[in-house]
């Protein structure tokens, strides 16, 4: 009976500690969330304040120097675009030549040789056909 009573008391105390732990855990989670959220909110406010101050200082300078800055920015953008396009076209050309070289000297070279032979035989057939037509035309005349 005493064992059953202890077991019952232990069960009650375990239940109460298990209930206390989730509450404490929830409180720690809430405190951590509030601390992290508050810190991020303060950093966000400081960033906003810095941006407003920087715009306040920079706006008059941008207005004064805009006749010089706008063409300079456009020129720099065009130069950068030109260099990037030139590099892209160069890479495309190198890739095409590399593929062509590998295809001509590698496994595709026999296909190209066969195609060249077929074209050559067609040219010979065409020349022979034209010669025969010319001979027939001369014989008819």
Swiss-Prot record:
Membrane-spanning residues: 38-58, 60-80, 81-101
Family stated for the protein in its record: Belongs to the oleosin family.
Protein name: Oleosin 14.9 kDa
Sequence ranges of Basic and acidic residues compositional bias: 1-22
GO terms for biological process, alphabetical: post-embryonic development; reproductive structure development
One GO location term (cellular component): monolayer-surrounded lipid storage body
UniProt xrefs under InterPro entries: Oleosin
Keyword Cytoplasm: no
Source organism (scientific name): Arabidopsis thaliana
Region ranges (Hydrophobic): 30-141
Function: May have a structural role to stabilize the lipid body during desiccation of the seed by preventing coalescence of the oil. Probably interacts with both lipid and phospholipid moieties of lipid bodies. May also provide recognition signals for specific lipase anchorage in lipolysis during seedling growth.
Pfam families to which the protein is assigned, alphabetical: Oleosin (PF01277)
UniProt region (Polar), positions on chain: 1-29
Renumbered residue ranges of the record's region Disordered: 1-24
Keywords: Lipid droplet, Membrane, Transmembrane, Transmembrane helix
UniProt-annotated location(s): Lipid droplet; Membrane
Principal cellular location given in the protein's record: other
Membrane topology: Multi-pass membrane protein
């Amino acid at each position: 009976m005493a064992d059953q009573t202890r077991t019952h008391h232990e069960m009650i105390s375990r239940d109460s500690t298990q209930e206390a732990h989730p509450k404490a855990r929830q409180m720690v989670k809430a405190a951590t969330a509030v601390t992290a959220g508050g810190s991020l909110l303060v950093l966000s406010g400081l960033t906003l304040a810095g941006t407003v101050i920087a715009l306040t200082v920079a706006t008059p300078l941008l207005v004064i120097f805009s006749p010089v800055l706008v063409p300079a920015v456009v020129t720099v953008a065009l130069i950068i675009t030109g260099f990037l396009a030139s590099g892209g076209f160069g890479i495309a050309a190198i890739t095409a030549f590399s593929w062509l070289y590998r295809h001509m000297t590698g496994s595709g070279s026999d296909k190209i040789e066969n195609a060249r032979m077929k074209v050559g035989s067609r040219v010979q057939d065409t020349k022979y056909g034209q010669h025969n037509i010319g001979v027939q035309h001369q014989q008819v005349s």
